[in-house]
């Protein structure tokens, strides 16, 4: 069946190709797993030949009509819709999955990815809050919830979220610990609590001394206060070494030289 469908697709007869697949999908003698396998191979062939996969959508709908409760089928269709850029339709499929099977972490993650991509902050908060209940040991939901609160300027909520998240992150996960402390530092700086901000940044660098975002932000904020400029220079230099083509980090490095009165080096890094 797939071979015939691929043949018709190759000669440009999409209608005949879809008919072959549809005939298989409505065949009562085939179980759902076999049908999903046939459809998966057909989609893979479309992708390999750089052809549009939209022709598979109607086939998915045909199969979903027969098996409306099949979670894996909805997951596959949702992923295909994401690849096609059909955000709203994909979100609908993943939302259905989370309603049918609330413990389906993959569907929640897809929903979160779509909400982040579309910058739908209320939806990010809804998803993360629910997932904190469902997956209490998953720190990623604390991380993105904190970002969402920060963007809403709910700084205390963001702080509380990150501090709670720190409690569930294993000490061995030094990268994530560092990122959380970095976010805490940014929040404290935003509310003008410099002392706590710098404490948080120091803690972040204890866990990961190459956290490039923290290195840059910490250095820049120190330079704005004209405080500990040599420390700021060292951190900024490391950030530039780690990401030499990052224009933001180069600008910070140049600015620190400028603040110290080293205008020659400042000019070199500004121009680079």
Please give the residue ranges for each predicted region.
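Alpha-solenoid helical repeat scaffolds
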Residues: 1-272
């Amino acid at each position: 069946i797939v071979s015939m469908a691929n043949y018709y697709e190759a000669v440009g007869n999409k209608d005949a190709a879809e008919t072959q697949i549809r005939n298989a999908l409505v065949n009562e003698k085939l179980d759902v797993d076999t049908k999903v396998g046939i459809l998966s191979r057909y989609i893979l062939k479309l992708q390999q030949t750089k052809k549009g996969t939209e022709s598979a959508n109607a086939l998915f709908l045909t199969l979903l009509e027969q098996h409306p409760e099949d979670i894996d089928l909805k997951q596959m269709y949702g992923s295909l819709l994401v690849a096609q850029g059909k955000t709203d339709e994909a979100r609908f499929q993943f939302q259905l999955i989370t309603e049918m099977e609330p413990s389906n972490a993959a569907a929640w993650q897809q929903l979160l990815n779509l909400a982040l991509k579309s910058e739908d902050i209320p939806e990010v908060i809804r998803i993360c809050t629910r997932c904190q209940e469902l997956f209490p040991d998953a720190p990623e939901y604390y991380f993105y919830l904190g970002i969402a609160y920060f963007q809403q300027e709910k700084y205390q909520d963001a702080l509380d979220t990150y501090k709670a998240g720190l409690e569930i992150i294993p000490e061995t996960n030094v990268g994530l610990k560092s990122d959380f402390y970095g976010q805490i530092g940014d929040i404290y700086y935003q509310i003008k609590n410099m002392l706590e901000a710098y404490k948080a940044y120091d803690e972040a660098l204890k866990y990961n001394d190459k956290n490039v975002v923290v290195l840059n932000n910490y250095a820049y904020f120190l330079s704005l206060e004209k405080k500990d400029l040599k420390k700021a220079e060292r951190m900024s230099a490391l950030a530039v070494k780690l990401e030499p083509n990052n224009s933001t980090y180069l600008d910070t490095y140049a600015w620190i030289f400028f603040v110290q009165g080293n205008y020659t080096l400042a000019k070199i890094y500004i121009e680079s």
